[in-house]
Amino acid sequence: MPKRDAPWLMAGTSKVSRSGNYSPSGGMGSKSNKANAWVNRPMYRKPRIYRMYKSPDVPKGCEGPCKVQSYEQRHDISHVGKVMCISDITRGNGITHRVGKRFCVKSVYILGKIWMDENIMLKNHTNSVIFWLVRDRRPYGTPMDFGQVFNMFDNEPSTATVKNDFRDRYQVMHRFNAKVSGGQYASNDQALVRRFWKVNNHVVYNHQEAGKYENHTENALLLYMACTHASNPVYATLKIRIYVYDSITN
């Protein structure tokens, strides 16, 4: 039996009561209203650190709307490494295009998985895939290979650091790894990958419209990938999204 009578069951009238509150938050009570009021309180009622160090939604020198570019691809990652450019944006007027030469990549979102082939999965081994998000300050020609940029001890990607000659040009912004293991009994043939970074990387193109690495003039974003096992490769199915704002100076 209901605790209160419904409006259409009230005696003496067939009209629905207009005095009732039928808003979605009306039945939650005063506790929810107080919580919402506290979360959405004005800025002057928050601590000073919230007022001093609040990061803007739109990067400085840029304007909205926020544009999104996605890169969906299956990668064959080997011991010698692989590279892809994730700041390739074609010039145009769409929500996935850049208006002019300059734009800012505010954040990068990487999600997907790394996995092994069925034949490799049965072998007893452990394989780690390492990812480097690198900023190329002076891009030219084609992206340099993994072995050209990084210095390794005994050709081991886990010991990779940027060569001294390229420390001013290539800057490692983020680095992470994921691990898979094979075997007949206790195998972990898949590993999920999910990363979200704020980068605020200001990219500059030349006068060309095509979104290619060769058309970059400043601050290209590169993603390097390499696995630690010398003979067993790993596959990576990734979806990489970058969130972009156009520059005001275009």
Swiss-Prot record:
Where does this protein chiefly localize?
virion
* Region of interest: Disordered: 1-31
Residues of the signal peptide: none
Motif range (Nuclear export signal): 95-116
Q: unnamed zinc finger positions in the chain?
A: 53-70
User: Which residues fall in a compositionally biased region of kind Polar residues?
Assistant: 14-31
A Gene Ontology biological process noted in the UniProt record is: viral penetration into host nucleus
What GO molecular function annotation could you give as one example from this UniProt entry? DNA binding
Q: Which InterPro entries match?
A: Gem_coat_AR1 (IPR000650), GV_A/BR1_coat (IPR000263), Viral_coat (IPR029053)
Family label? Belongs to the geminiviridae capsid protein family.
Record's Gene3D superfamilies?
Answer: 2.60.120.20
What keywords are assigned to this protein? Capsid protein, DNA-binding, Host nucleus, Host-virus interaction, Metal-binding, T=1 icosahedral capsid protein, Viral penetration into host nucleus, Virion, Virus entry into host cell, Zinc, Zinc-finger
Q: From what organism does this protein derive?
A: Bean golden yellow mosaic virus (isolate Puerto Rico) (BGYMV)
Q: How does it assemble?
A: Homomultimer. Binds to single-stranded and double-stranded viral DNA. Interacts (via nuclear localization signals) with host importin alpha-1a.
| Listed name of the protein | Capsid protein
**What function does this protein fulfil?**
Encapsidates the viral DNA into characteristic twinned ('geminate') particles. Binds the genomic viral ssDNA and shuttles it into and out of the cell nucleus. The CP of bipartite geminiviruses is not required for cell-to-cell or systemic movement.
In chain numbering, motif Nuclear localization signal lies across 34-48
Subcellular localization(s) per the UniProt record = Virion; Host nucleus
Residue ranges annotated as transmembrane are: none
Motif mapping: Bipartite nuclear localization signal = 3-19, 194-241
Q: Which GO terms describe its cellular component?
A: host cell; host cell nucleus; T=1 icosahedral viral capsid
* Taxonomy, superkingdom: Viruses
